[in-house]
Amino acid sequence: MGDPKRQRKKYETPSHPWIKERLDRERVLKRNYALKNKKELWRHETQLKEFRRRARRLLAARGKQAEIERQQLLQRLYRLGLLPADAVLDDVLSLTVEDVLERRLQTIVYRKGLARTMKQARQLIVHGHIEVNGQVIRSPGYLVLREEEDTITYAKGSPFAKEGHPERMVIEQAKQGGEA
């Protein structure tokens, strides 16, 4: 069978543990996006660092292969919904961690009005009440692709799929109260 690949961390911890400005910023992001722990935030920060690192390397690179990789990076970020279709490589450098956090399934479920709060959105996802493109996704940190965004609904077998579910009625009332 061969040797399995070694599992590696998907995040980098901060270089210094007690920088007050960073701690304050992380606390606000953790609260606003209802993250379970800072590891979730660090994972998305590391993803963003990697995108930016690739963009800086490709800005300096010349040649046919560099142009192919530029297009692939821009296409990937477009599919993730992080950049518009007409973006250039410099736009990658202006991305923030908030842009990445806005593409999480948990955030999109809340923004679409399928949940009253971010924490409820997380719970609905973990409990299997939300499906994306007909597939139940149980990971709140799943980055939703641009074409999948319109397919986010309550799961077919979920009690929330019924129109008369009491919690759905509360969510609808909260949505209408917010619009008025």
UniProtKB/Swiss-Prot annotation:
Biological processes, Gene Ontology terms: ribosomal small subunit biogenesis; translation
Domain of life the protein comes from: Archaea
Keyword Magnesium among UniProt keywords: no
GO cellular component terms attached to this protein's record: small ribosomal subunit
Domain S4 RNA-binding: 103-165
Keywords, sorted A to Z: Ribonucleoprotein, Ribosomal protein, RNA-binding, rRNA-binding
CDD domains: S4 (cd00165)
Keyword Thylakoid included in the entry's annotation: no
Transmembrane segments: none
Pfam families: Ribosomal_S4, S4
Family to which this protein belongs: Belongs to the universal ribosomal protein uS4 family.
Biological role: One of the primary rRNA binding proteins, it binds directly to 16S rRNA where it nucleates assembly of the body of the 30S subunit. With S5 and S12 plays an important role in translational accuracy.
NCBIfam families: PRK04051.1, uS4_arch
Subunit organization: Part of the 30S ribosomal subunit. Contacts protein S5. The interaction surface between S4 and S5 is involved in control of translational fidelity.
Protein name, entry field: Small ribosomal subunit protein uS4
Organism: Thermococcus kodakarensis (strain ATCC BAA-918 / JCM 12380 / KOD1)
Highest classification ranks of the organism: Archaea, Methanobacteriati, Methanobacteriota, Thermococci, Thermococcales
